[in-house]
Amino acid sequence: MNAAPLVGYSSSGSEDEAEAVAAGRSKPGSGLHRCGQNPLPSQRFPVPDSVLNMFPSTEEGPEDDSARHGGRIRTFPHERGNWATHIYIPYEANEEFQDLLDVLLPRAQMFAPRLVQMEEFHLSLSQSVVLRHHWILPFVQVLKDRMASFQRFFFTANRVKIYTNQEKTRTFIGLEVSSGHAQFLDMVSEVDRVMKEFDLTTFYQDPSFHVSLAWCVGDARLQLEGQCQQELQEIVDEFEDSEMLLRVLAEQVRCKSGNKFFSMPLK
C-alpha cells in the first residue's frame, strides 16, 4: 500500500487554534534622578488574586492539554513569543457543499467512527511554521508583496484522497485538486521564497493540493483507503451538480499567525 500523502497542518491544527501568543518585552525603568538627590522610596503592594484572574496574561500561551483539542498533540512545543503560522486559500462552504458532506461523513464513519467534520475549509499553501512575534508584520508585508501580482482563478477539487500529517497522529479525508494545479504551484513558489527569507520550512516537494473535509486522531489509513475511498468517490461523482459545486473561485490568500488573520485579495 502506498503511503498516504502528507498535509501541511501541525498536529494541533494550526487553522483552528493559536499555537502561541506574543510575549511582552519588559522595558528597563529609566531610574533617573538629580545628582545628589535620593530617589523617593516606593512600595509595591501585591495585587489580589481575584483581580489578577480577571486579566489573563497575554504572555502565556495555551496549555498543552490535548483533551481540550479533540486529542490532538502539538507538533512543536509552545514557547512564549512564538506564533504558529499558516498560509492558505479559504473556502466558504455553501449549503449545497454541506449537503454533500452530510452524505459523505456518515458513510466514512462506517469505516472510521472517530471521524469529525472540519470546522472550516481551506487549501494550504504552506506548512505550519513558527514565527517570532516581532517577525509577523515584516513577514506579512513580504508575503503581500509576493502575492500582489496573482489574479483570481477557478480550481476544481473533486478527487477523494486520504492524508496524514507528518507525525501520523491525525488522518484526513480530502478532495484533491484536479484543475488549477499549475496556479497553485506558482503561488507556492512565491510563498517558499518568503519562507526562505525568514529561514522557515518550505512546502512539500510534490504537493497534493486539497481541501480537507474530515479528520480523526491517529493513523486511520487502513480503514479509509481502498473500499471506503472508492465509495466516497462514487458519492462525489454522483452527487447532483457536483461538477459546478466543486469548482471554486480562489479570491484571496490568507495568513493566520497565532490568533491574527491577514487577508490578501487576488486581483
Curated annotation (Swiss-Prot):
One cellular component (GO) term of this entry: nucleus
Domain of life of the source: Eukaryota
Protein name per Swiss-Prot or TrEMBL: U6 snRNA phosphodiesterase 1
Record's catalysed reaction(s): a 3'-end uridylyl-uridine-RNA = a 3'-end 2',3'-cyclophospho-uridine-RNA + uridine; a 3'-end uridylyl-adenosine-RNA = a 3'-end 2',3'-cyclophospho-uridine-RNA + adenosine
Alphabetical list of InterPro entries matching this protein: Cyclic_Pdiesterase, Usb1
Matching HAMAP family: USB1
Chain residues that bind AMP: 122-124, 204, 206-212
PANTHER family: U6 SNRNA PHOSPHODIESTERASE 1
Keywords: Hydrolase, Lyase, Nuclease, Nucleus
Active site: 122, 210
Family: Belongs to the 2H phosphoesterase superfamily. USB1 family.
Enzyme type, top EC level: lyase
Gene giving rise to this polypeptide: Usb1
Subunit annotation: Interacts with PLRG1, CDC5L and PRPF19.
GO MF annotation, one: 3'-5'-RNA exonuclease activity
Regions crossing the membrane: none
Binding residues for UMP: 166, 204, 208-212
Summary of the function given for this chain in its UniProt record: 3'-5' RNA exonuclease that trims the 3' end of oligo(U) and oligo(A) tracts of the pre-U6 small nuclear RNA (snRNA) molecule, leading to the formation of a mature U6 snRNA 3' end-terminated with a 2',3'-cyclic phosphate. Participates in the U6 snRNA 3' end processing that prevents U6 snRNA degradation. In addition also removes uridines from the 3' end of U6atac snRNA and possibly the vault RNA VTRNA1-1.
Gene3D superfamilies: Cyclic phosphodiesterase
Intracellular or extracellular location(s): Nucleus
EC number: 4.6.1.-
Region described as Disordered: spans on this chain: 1-72
